[in-house]
C-alpha cells in the first residue's frame, strides 16, 4: 500500500474535511490551546510520529511563540513547514529554528486559492518524464531541411512563412495525472528570425477523446514552465508546434512533472537552474546538522526525472546537496554551455558560503554518470575528497563502444556526443574525451582524496580507472580503490556498498564523524 502524505495543521479551523476526498493524505490537527492546558501534548505528538512516521508538511495558523518553535524543533524537516501569511511576523523571521528548517510564509489571495494550494502540494514522492524529439512528426507541408538527432533534438531549417504554420507534432502524448498540478517544460532553441507557438491540448481519456482544454503559448511566454491546474480526472496532453519567420528551430524533449508550485522542484525545497538555451539541472540542499563537510551527490542515469540519493545522504547527518541532470533520455553527464557548467559551480560555491565552509570541507560524489560530474567539477573545486563508483570519464569512447562492444545499449552517450560535438566522427569522439582530461589534468589534485570503486570488466568505459590512476599519481593524490568483477551493470549493490563504505571512512578520518552504530556506542 502506498505511503500516505502526512500533514499536521497547528491552530486555526481544522481543514481535514477539505482533504477527505484525497485518500493519499493523512491529516492531523493540533489545537494550540493544548500549549496552556495539556502538558502532555509533546508526548502525544511523539507517539504519533513514532507510530506513523514524520510529517511531510506542517501548516501553522498561530502567532509566534517560543513554545511553538520548540515544538517545531521536534517535528519539522527542512522546507516542510509553512506559516499562514496572516500570522507571519518578524519574530518568526528571526527565530533560529525557523531559519534552520527554512520555515516560510504561505501566501495566497483568497481562501479558495489557499485550499487549492494545500491540496496541490499534498502528495508523496516525486515524478517527471518526457517525450523525445525522435517521436515528433514533421508536418508534410514543411519543405525545409529536417535532421533528427536522437533524443537530443529535431532540427528544422528554412522558410516557415509569415503566419504561424504547423511544423511538428508528437505521436506520443504526455499523461495528465488527476489531482496534480502538472508542470510542462519544452526544450527549444532558435537561430534567426523565427517565432514558435506551442499548443497543448488536454484530451479526455476513453473512447470519445473529447477536447477538455487548449492552451496556446508563444516561445516568449515559455520563459517559465507552464503549470496546468489540478483537475479531478486523468487526461492526455497532446503537443503541436507552429512557426513563422526564417531560420533554424531546434526542438528538444518536452518535460512533464508533478509540480509543487512555488514550494519546490520535485521535492519541497528543490530548485532548478536553466541557461539561456533552456538547458536545466536540478538541485536540492539539505542543511543536515550544519557541520562540515558539505556532501554533494550527482545523480546517475535515470529516465524518471527527479532527485536520487536523498535517504542515503540524509543518513550521514551532514549537510548535503543533490544535483540532477534531466536532459536527453536520462541525463547528459552534467556538461553543456559555459553558462550551464558555471551554474553548477556557482550552486556548490554558494552553498559552501551559506554554511560558512571552505573548499576543504567539501566532498563530491556520484555513481556511473554521476561519477563524471563528481570528477569533472571536483577537479575545479579543490574538495577534501571525491568518491565515485563505476567511473565514466571518456564519454566519446562510451558512445563509440555502442557499435560493437555494447550494441543497442546506452544510446544516451551518442546523444551527448552529437549534442556537444555535432557528429559521431572519430575527431568528435576524441574531442569529447578531451573535454574531461583537459580539465582534470591541469588542476592541482594533491590535497584531494580519491575513493574509487570500479568494475574490472566495465563495458562502458573499460579503462577509466587505469587512465585516472597515472594522473592522480603524478599529482601525488591519495587514492583508495576497490575493483569488482563484472561489467558496468553487473553488481550495483556491491558498488553501492563500497561507495557508502568510502564515505564512512572519509567522514570519520577527516571530519571525526563516526557513522557505525557500534563505534557510536563506545
From Swiss-Prot:
GO terms for biological process: protein transport. SUPFAM superfamilies: alpha/beta-Hydrolases (SSF53474). InterPro entries: AB_hydrolase_fold (IPR029058), Asp2 (IPR022267). Keywords: Protein transport, Translocation, Transport. Disruption phenotype: No effect on cell growth, significantly reduces export of the cell wall protein SraP. The small amount that is exported seems to be glycosylated normally. Belongs to the accessory Sec system protein Asp2 family. Part of the accessory SecA2/SecY2 protein translocation apparatus required to export cell wall protein SraP. Part of the accessory SecA2/SecY2 system specifically required to export SraP, a serine-rich repeat cell wall protein encoded upstream in the same operon. This is Accessory Sec system protein Asp2. It comes from Staphylococcus aureus (strain NCTC 8325 / PS 47). The gene is asp2.
Amino acid at each position: 500500500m502506498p505511503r500516505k502524505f502526512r500533514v499536521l495543521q497547528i491552530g486555526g479551523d481544522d481543514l481535514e474535511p477539505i482533504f477527505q476526498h484525497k485518500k493519499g493524505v493523512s491529516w492531523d490537527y493540533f489545537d494550540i490551546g493544548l500549549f496552556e492546558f495539556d502538558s502532555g501534548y509533546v508526548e502525544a505528538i511523539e507517539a504519533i510520529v513514532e507510530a506513523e512516521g514524520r510529517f511531510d508538511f506542517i501548516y501553522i495558523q498561530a502567532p509566534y511563540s517560543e513554545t511553538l518553535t520548540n515544538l517545531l524543533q521536534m517535528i519539522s524537516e527542512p522546507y516542510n513547514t509553512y506559516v499562514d501569511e496572516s500570522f507571519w511576523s518578524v519574530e518568526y523571521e528571526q527565530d533560529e529554528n525557523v531559519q534552520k528548517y527554512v520555515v516560510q510564509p504561505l501566501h495566497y489571495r483568497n481562501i479558495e486559492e489557499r485550499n487549492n494550494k494545500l491540496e496541490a502540494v499534498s502528495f508523496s514522492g516525486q515524478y517527471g518524464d518526457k517525450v523525445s524529439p525522435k517521436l515528433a512528426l514533421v508536418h508534410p507541408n514543411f519543405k525545409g531541411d529536417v535532421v533528427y538527432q536522437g533524443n537530443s533534438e529535431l532540427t528544422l531549417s528554412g522558410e516557415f512563412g509569415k503566419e504561424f504554420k504547423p511544423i511538428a507534432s508528437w505521436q506520443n502524448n504526455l499523461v495528465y495525472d488527476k489531482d496534480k498540478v502538472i508542470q510542462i517544460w519544452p526544450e527549444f532553441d532558435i537561430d534567426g528570425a523565427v517565432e514558435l507557438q506551442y499548443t497543448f491540448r488536454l484530451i479526455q481519456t476513453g473512447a470519445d477523446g473529447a477536447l477538455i482544454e487548449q492552451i496556446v503559448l508563444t516561445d516568449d511566454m515559455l520563459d517559465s514552465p507552464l503549470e496546468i491546474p489540478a483537475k479531478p480526472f486523468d487526461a492526455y496532453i497532446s503537443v503541436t508546434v507552429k512557426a513563422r519567420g526564417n531560420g533554424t528551430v531546434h526542438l528538444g524533449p518536452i518535460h512533464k512533472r508533478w509540480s509543487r508550485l512555488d514550494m519546490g522542484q520535485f521535492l519541497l525545497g528543490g530548485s532548478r537552474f536553466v541557461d539561456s538555451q533552456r538547458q536545466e539541472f536540478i538541485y536540492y540542499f539539505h542543511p543536515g546538522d550544519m557541520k562540515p563537510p558539505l556532501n554533494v551527490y550527482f545523480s546517475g542515469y535515470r529516465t524518471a526525472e527527479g532527485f536520487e540519493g536523498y535517504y542515503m545522504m540524509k543518513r550521514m547527518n551532514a549537510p548535503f546537496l543533490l544535483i540532477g541532470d534531466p536532459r536527453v533520455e536520462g541525463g547528459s553527464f552534467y556538461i553543456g554551455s559555459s553558462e550551464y557548467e558555471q551554474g553548477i559551480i556557482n550552486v556548490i560555491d554558494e552553498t559552501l558560503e551559506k554554511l560558512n565552509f571552505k573548499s576543504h570541507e567539501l566532498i563530491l560524489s556520484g555513481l556511473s554518470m554521476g561519477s563524471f560530474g563528481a570528477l569533472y567539477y571536483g577537479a575545479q573545486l579543490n574538495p577534501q575528497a571525491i568518491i565515485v563508483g563505476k567511473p565514466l570519464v571518456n564519454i566519446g569512447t562510451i558512445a563509440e563502444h555502442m557499435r560493437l562492444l555494447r550494441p543497442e545499449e546506452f544510446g544516451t552517450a551518442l546523444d551527448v556526443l552529437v549534442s556537444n560535438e555535432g557528429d559521431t566522427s572519430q575527431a568528435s569522439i576524441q574531442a569529447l574525451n578531451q573535454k574531461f582530461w583537459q580539465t582534470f589534468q591541469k588542476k592541482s589534485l594533491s590535497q584531494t582524496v580519491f575513493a574509487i570503486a570500479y568494475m574490472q570488466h566495465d563495458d562502458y568505459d573499460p579503462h577509466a580507472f587505469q587512465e585516472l590512476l597515472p594522473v592522480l599519481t603524478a599529482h601525488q593524490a591519495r587514492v583508495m580503490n576497490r575493483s569488482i568483477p563484472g561489467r558496468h551493470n553487473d553488481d550495483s549493490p556491491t558498488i553501492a556498498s563500497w561507495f557508502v563504505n568510502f564515505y564512512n571512512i572519509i567522514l570519520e578520518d577527516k571530519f571525526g564523524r563516526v557513522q557505525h552504530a557500534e563505534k557510536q556506542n563506545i
